[in-house]
Amino acid sequence: KKIEMDVLRNGEVIGYSNYFFESAENKMTVKNYTKFKVKLLGVTVFSVLSESIEKYENDKLFFFQSNTFQNDKEKFVNLKYNESSKKFIINGSSYKGEASLDCIIGNWWNHKIFKASKQISPLSGSIKEQVVIFLGKEKININNKEYLTEHYKLKSKDESLPDDKKLNFDIWFNPENNLIIKVSYSKMGN
C-alpha cells in the first residue's frame, strides 16, 4: 500500500511526499521519500530531500530513522523505544534525550496526530507541543473528486516560538478512510 502526496506551491506541483507501507502479522513498516524545491526568480530558496523509516509493533512505534537535507543542511533523527524506561530515546540534529510515549512522529500519513499533545519532528527530532482545533466539516475538491472532510488547525502550543519554528497547519481529514487528504501552510506562498 502507498500514499502519494504532491507538494504544491501556489497551486503548482513542486515535489512529492510519498509513503509506502509493509505489513506482516502485528508489525508495520512505513517508508517515506520527500523531495521539493521552492524557487523564486529561478533561484532555489528552500529545498527538502528526505528519507525515513518508521517501525511499529502492535500499533506502537519502536523505531524511527530519518536523513534529511534541508537547504543543503543535514538533519537527522534516530529514535528507539527503550523497554526498561518505557520512553523513546532520541538522537536528533535538534534534540538528544528522552521523549514520552504520548509523542507521535509528525508525519502526514498518521491521523493519530490529531489526538497527540506533542509531536516529534521527523526531520530533526525536536519535540513540539501542539494544539489541534476542529474547525468544522467541509467539502473539498482534489483531482476532480469531491470529499467530505473534517477541517482542523494544528498549531504550536507555545506562541512565543519564532515563526520559523512554529507549527501552523490547516489539515483536511477524510474520516471515511482515515486519511489526511490535504495539508496547507504558508511559507513563501501557499
Residue ranges, per PLM feature:
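Hydrophobic transmembrane alpha-helices
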Residues: 104-108
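Acidic, serine/threonine-rich low-complexity disordered tracts
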Residues: 1-83, 109-190
